[in-house]
Each structure stands twice: as C-alpha cells, then as structure tokens.
Regions:
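N-terminal export signals
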Residues: 2, 8-25
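Kelch-like beta-propeller repeat domains
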Residues: 5, 13, 26-341
C-alpha cells in the first residue's frame, strides 16, 4: 500500500481558514466573476468537492510544444477565495479522474508517462482517508478522459478512452468507450455497471435529483456531441434527453472538453473546444439545463473561453477552474471564475 502524508491537506485547509479574506456572497444574475487563480497554469484536469473545498490534481501544459505532466494537487477554499497546494501525487498524471466516494477523495486513472509515450492510460486508484493517500483496488482496465461522480456513496466512472489493443502509450492507441464502473469502498472493488448509451470521451457529469447525468463529449471519428444521458440507479436505466444546442456564435456543436456542475436544481455546462479544417476554437458559452422542462437555456458566457477545465459547485455557486485557452494544447491557464445560476 502506497501512503502519502495527508496532513498537508489538513494543514492547508486550516491555514486557508485563517487568511485575511472576507467571503462575499455572490448574487444570481451578475454573470461570471473572477476568483483567485490556481497558482499554476494547467489543463486537462478534473476536480471534486471534499469538506467544502475543491481539490484538483495533475493535468498538463505544453510550453514550447514540450508536454509537461503535473503531479501537484490544488485545494481551493471558497470561503476565503484562497488556494493551497496539497501533497504531490505518487506519479505525474494528466486527465486523472478526481471524484469522491461517500465523501472520501479519490484520484483514479488518467494518462502517465512510460517508455511507450505520454499517453499511457493507467489503472491506479488512490484514496485520501485519515492522514494518508492510499492505494486501493485498481480499475479493471485503464481509463482516462472519463466522467466521475459520487452517487449513492459510490464513485462512478462513465465513458472515456482506453486502449483496446496491446499498444498503450500514444493518443492514437486509445479508443472511445461506454464503460461504467462503480467503486465499493467497503469491499474495495470495482463493479461493472450498465454501460452508457454512447461511447465517447471528454464528456462532463454531475449528480442531480439522485441521478447521474452525462453531457456532451466527443468521439474521435464524429467530433463533438451535445448528447445528454441520465442514469437512474434505482431502475438501472439510461434515458436520453434534450441535447446541448450548437453554439450560436460559431455554429459548432458544444461537446468535447466541456465542464459541468449542478446548482440550484439545474445543470450548468460550459466551455469545451471544437476542431475544424485550418484550426478550431474554444467555447465561452454557458448552457443551463432545467430537468423539469427538459430544456437548455443560454447563460452568461465565461470571461475566458476554456476547454479541459474543471467544474464544481459549492453552496449554489459554480466554479470554472483553469483549462486550455486555445484549441488543443499550447496555452494552459489558471483562471478561476464563479457563477450563481
């Protein structure tokens, strides 16, 4: 069992609480507002809320076309608008899923560096529990670019990319999957669940009204999709609902590399990227979904368009964290914005 001192997490949280910041209540309808930036630039990250704080881990950036893979963890305290750095990951990762399991923080899978390349999909799973980050049961198969949520006290991972053949190290070695797994903390094992209706990667997810929602994403061959799928754990059933609309500004489909959180009884999706001959671009759009009406409404655009960003909601406020500011790699940032939908 690998153990990393988690007291840094606890100390960081305590230190943040003593900083001389005054939390200001944000009102709905004012649009996205700037918050304290993540101290380092990074993209291809995920996050989860643990004890009222937002935790990110890993990621990548590509200055001068050189891929740099992160092993840092960041802890954001919304009450003080301050960041602290947590303990380093056991190994560098980009696209690792950050999720809670019954409230306990987990960091799972993602891509690491190996002799085969910088896109080696991993099976590792680490859990922060007590004063250590410990190795728990690995994934049944390598997985990256997935959706991770805490549903019914279990960590669920849905869709993503993994190698279907022996090769595992390059981006092209990975394929889109509809896999759906759930981690049982008491049994320390992953259970195979009903797969998603569509294989895709780089989607976004959230829990709302006791269900797991997966929105957007893309396929290698088909590009972005606005598809919205809902998993009902009680009936073990997937339903497909109204998709995210195409971007009015570009005509392109909002899909891959977006982020989403649930707040105020609604889903809030934003960001992402699209590819096109000669380039592509990054979305600033925000879309708000009302589950009662099965309808998406355009929300205020982010101040900084981004993809590969992280999303979380705390006390009704949605946070958009870091991400790539140009299509693909090349300009990662640490910008943080907040919205009350």
């Amino acid at each position: 069992m690998t153990r990393i001192d988690r007291r840094a997490f606890l100390a960081a949280a305590t230190a943040s609480a003593t900083l001389p910041f005054a939390a200001r209540a944000q009102e709905p309808g004012v649009g996205w507002v700037s918050k304290a930036s993540l101290p380092w630039a990074v993209q291809e990250i995920y996050c989860a809320v643990s004890n009222g704080r937002i935790v990110t881990a890993g990621g990548l950036r590509r200055p001068a076309r050189v891929t740099e893979i992160e092993d840092r963890t960041g802890i954001y305290d919304p009450a003080t608008d301050a960041w602290s750095e947590g303990p380093r990951l056991p190994s560098h990762r980009h696209h690792p899923m950050v999720v809670t399991c019954g409230g306990a923080l987990m960091i799972v899978g993602g891509y690491g560096r190996s002799d085969a390349g910088d896109w080696t999909a991993m099976t590792d799973a680490w859990m922060a529990d007590g004063e250590a980050l410990s190795t728990v049961a690995p994934l049944p198969r390598p997985l990256s670019e997935s959706v991770g949520v805490d549903l019914g006290g279990r960590a669920h991972l849905v869709t993503g990319r993994r190698p279907l053949g022996a090769a595992n190290g390059q981006w092209n070695d990975q394929s889109d999957v509809a896999d759906h797994w759930a981690y049982d903390r008491d049994a320390d094992r992953w259970q195979t669940m009903r797969p998603a209706p569509m294989a895709r990667n780089s989607a976004a997810g959230a829990v709302l009204d006791g269900a797991l929602w997966v929105a957007g994403g893309r396929t290698v061959t088909g590009g972005g999709t606005g598809r919205l799928d809902r998993y009902d754990p009680a009936g073990d059933r997937w339903d497909t609902l109204a998709p995210i609309p195409a971007s009015p500004a570009t005509g392109q489909q909002v899909g891959g590399g977006l982020a989403m959180a649930a707040a105020g009884g609604k889903l809030v999706a934003f960001g992402g990227e699209w590819f096109a001959p000669g380039g592509g671009g990054v979305f600033a759009e925000t879309w708000i979904y009302d589950p009662k009406a099965d309808h998406w409404t355009a929300g205020p655009p982010m101040r900084t368009p981004r993809h590969g960003l992280a999303a979380a909601a705390v006390d009704g406020t949605v946070y958009a964290i870091a991400g790539g500011e140009v299509v693909s790699g090349g300009r990662a940032g640490g910008v943080v914005e907040a919205l009350v939908p």
